[in-house]
Structures are given as C-alpha cells and as structure tokens.
Swiss-Prot record:
One of its GO terms (cellular component) is extracellular region. Inhibits voltage-gated potassium channels. Residues 1-23 form the signal peptide. Contains 3 disulfide bonds. One of its GO terms (molecular function) is toxin activity. Belongs to the scoloptoxin-03 family. Keywords: Disulfide bond, Ion channel impairing toxin, Neurotoxin, Potassium channel impairing toxin, Secreted, Signal, Toxin, Voltage-gated potassium channel impairing toxin. This is Kappa-scoloptoxin(03)-Ssm1e. It is found in: Secreted. Expressed by the venom gland. Coiled coil: none annotated. It comes from Scolopendra mutilans.
Length: 75
C-alpha cells in the first residue's frame, strides 16, 4: 500500500512539473482570444469606471491577476 502511494506521489510531482514548464503566463490568451480574460477585464472596468484599466488588464498578465484578485475579494 505504501509503495503505491509513493508511486502516485511521484507521478503527481512529474505531471505538476511538466504542466508548470509547458504552460506559462505568456501562453494565456489576450482579451481578443480569451473569453475568460475578456469577461474578467470588463467586470474590473465596470468597478473602476476607467477605460485604461480594461486596456491594462488585456495587455498585462500582472494587471489581469490583480483584477481577478480584487474581484474575488468582493464576492
């Protein structure tokens, strides 16, 4: 039983490492290609009433993360 748990743990670690290496923030679609990002940026823009926030959210992954974090705190 312990050996099968160890094997599963090693497999999970390998899968996590491969996933992390092959999917980066740059791979995420911009607002033109990604519906989730577009919706999140629009909601953030409605909260701030500043069109510049929408543009920043669409073009910068860090701004997108901050916007999503702020929206999650409101819920």
């Amino acid at each position: 039983m312990k050996s099968s748990m160890a094997i599963l743990l090693v497999m999970a670690l390998i899968i996590f490492t491969l996933d992390k290496n092959y999917s980066t923030a740059k791979d995420l679609p911009s607002c033109e290609k990604g519906i989730h990002r577009k919706v999140t940026c629009k909601q953030c823009n409605k909260r701030s009433d500043n069109d510049d926030d929408y543009t920043k959210c669409c073009n910068s992954f860090d701004a997108f993360l901050m916007c999503g974090f702020l929206l999650s705190k409101e819920s």
